[in-house]
Design a protein with these regions (language model features):
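Alpha-helical segment proximal to the catalytic Tyr-Lys
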Residues: 35-39, 98
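Active-site helix of classical SDR
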Residues: 22, 30
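Short, flexible catalytic-loop segment of classical short-chain dehydrogenase/reductase
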Residues: 27, 48-59
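A conserved structural motif in NAD(P)-dependent oxidoreductases
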Residues: 74-85, 96
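Residue(s) in the substrate-gating loop at a strand-loop-helix junction
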Residues: 6
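Conserved SDR Rossmann-fold cofactor-binding beta-strand/turn motif
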Residues: 43-53, 93-96, 106-108
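Short C-terminal tail/terminal secondary-structure segment
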Residues: 11, 90, 101-115
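Active-site "substrate specificity/gating" loop of NAD(P)-dependent dehydrogenases
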Residues: 12-16, 21, 38-39
Length: 115
């Protein structure tokens, strides 16, 4: 199982607190599914994206000032694109990750290093 959480799970927010809390709760679900169903061969992991250019985040990246701040917070100095997550999802779905469960993989251009 591959769940989509967020780097928001790892830090508080005064603007989107309920969203971040829900993403942290999802990581709890991932770990519990991994523990409960692991003996049956079920693996559960989460992908935790940073700011990605999607419809959901449009208000952030379409505002040049906010986009520049967000880009500046990443080591790669750019915002994520939906395509940036394909490889991680393919890896988590493949045999290459067959001994991996209960984990949260961040894909955030390095922005979570500062959390």
């Amino acid at each position: 199982m591959i769940f989509t959480s967020s780097i928001g799970a790892f830090k508080p927010s005064l603007e989107i607190g309920a969203y971040n809390i829900s993403k942290l709760a999802l990581l709890g679900l991932v770990r519990n599914v991994a523990a409960e169903f692991g003996p049956s061969g079920v693996r559960a992991n989460a992908v935790c994206p940073g700011l990605v250019k999607t419809e959901f985040a449009k208000a952030l990246y379409e505002d040049p000032k906010r986009a520049k701040i967000a880009e500046g917070m990443t080591a790669l100095k750019r915002l994520g694109e939906p395509e940036d997550f394909r490889g991680v999802a393919v890896f988590l779905a493949s045999k290459a990750s067959e001994y991996m469960t209960g984990q949260a993989v961040t894909v955030c251009g390095g922005s979570n290093m500062w959390a």
